[in-house]
Amino acid sequence: MENIFEEYESNVRSYCRKWPVEMVHAKGSIIKDINGNEYIDFFDGAGALNYGHNPDYIKEKLINYLQEDGIIHSLDMYTLPKEKFISYFEEKILKPRNLDYKVLFPGPTGTNSIEVALKLARKYTGRQDIWAFTGAFHGMTLGALSLTTEASARNAAGVSLNNTVHIPAPYSMGGNFDTIKYMRELLEDDHSGYSCPAAIIIETVQQEGGIHVFSKEFLRDLRVFCTEYNILLICDEVQIGCSRSGTFFSFERADIVPDIVCMSKSIGGYGLPFALTLLKREID
């Protein structure tokens, strides 16, 4: 095994270095290696497999679709499968939650969804800066990486990561940091050196930066703050969405409505690459 990977696969790899086991089979929450050993998969594809490996009810649909020669790639042309998806998503996910979003298909990955959200926010507001929180992880392409605080990831960029401000999260500075007050002071003080951002982006539950759950009260205060200063609120649901937190959208528990929502990973259902960006109609 190691000879093939060491000789032909790039050194740019991560998880396998810490756990050099060759997998061969997966079902539900169990994965099996080539020696027959079974493991509970707590990796979960980093949130891409919320419904388990090879769930029968999705697998059957996929096989039938392929056997019927369903459309696999169509750029952004109109297709019947896309029409059915949008209709189903509207009726089953958005309307029951009183969410009036337009659905944008940005590309296959979560970082694509984040990049689109940043471009939309900057275009809509005419501002450049985006505020994110310490402990954030939003992706590995340059725009998304500029929001990410992990040092090793940022250092790998090889270029300056600009137009982003990282705000101390409430758990920072020894805990109980008044983040809202701090942001307000940055905007109200003419000598702070900061200007009003186009958007503030948040994972309601940070994962890569440690399991930090932002309180309902903080999320509500953040929504009020963004509205007060005409700042767009972006919720990154890429890893915590699709029922991973108990509700389909992780922000539901706070009863807030973000301006833009980024989705990927388990929205593909089967570990397949798929992403959405949801945006309020006035931003479209």
Feature annotation, model-predicted:
Residues 1-284:
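Conserved N-terminal phosphate-binding loop of PLP-dependent enzymes in the Aspartate aminotransferase
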